[in-house]
Amino acid sequence: MGRSLKKGPYCDPKLLKKIEKLNQNNEKKVIKTWSRRSTILPQMVGHTIAVYDGRKHVPVYITEEMVGHKLGEFAPTRTFKGHGHHTERSTALK
């Protein structure tokens, strides 16, 4: 279920403050954040935000198509390595 339109999109106040500061100074720095739940806003376009995935910070370059989505959508928390493979021992037991 989505967030109420009356409330508006949620963005971490600290993250928003850092973005506004960089926009005023026309700087492009990587911003580290742990706030995966923050919604991507139009003023974030063009910045690189390092989103924490539980292990490391994943750099995410923000484009116009990402506006309205959450930061966590672009930093997967699980890495799928594939299902188990047959080994020589397991095939010999048959």
Swiss-Prot record:
Cellular-component GO terms for this entry: cytoplasm; small ribosomal subunit
SUPFAM superfamilies linked: Ribosomal protein S19
Keyword Endoplasmic reticulum: no
Domain of life where this protein originates: Bacteria
Pfam families (UniProt xref): Ribosomal_S19 (PF00203)
Keywords (A to Z) from UniProt: Ribonucleoprotein, Ribosomal protein, RNA-binding, rRNA-binding
Single GO term (MF): structural constituent of ribosome
Gene3D superfamilies referenced in this protein's UniProt entry, alphabetically: 30s Ribosomal Protein S19, Chain A
UniProt keyword rRNA-binding, yes or no: yes
InterPro entries in UniProt: Ribosomal_uS19, Ribosomal_uS19_bac-type, Ribosomal_uS19_CS, Ribosomal_uS19_SF
A GO BP entry: ribosomal small subunit assembly
Residue ranges crossing the lipid bilayer per the database entry: none
Known function: Protein S19 forms a complex with S13 that binds strongly to the 16S ribosomal RNA.
HAMAP family xrefs: Ribosomal_uS19
Record-stated family: Belongs to the universal ribosomal protein uS19 family.
Matches recorded under PANTHER family: RIBOSOMAL PROTEIN S19P FAMILY MEMBER, SMALL RIBOSOMAL SUBUNIT PROTEIN US19M
The protein's name in its UniProt record: Small ribosomal subunit protein uS19
Organism, as annotated: Caldicellulosiruptor saccharolyticus (strain ATCC 43494 / DSM 8903 / Tp8T 6331)
Organism phylogeny: Bacteria, Bacillati, Bacillota, Bacillota incertae sedis, Caldicellulosiruptorales
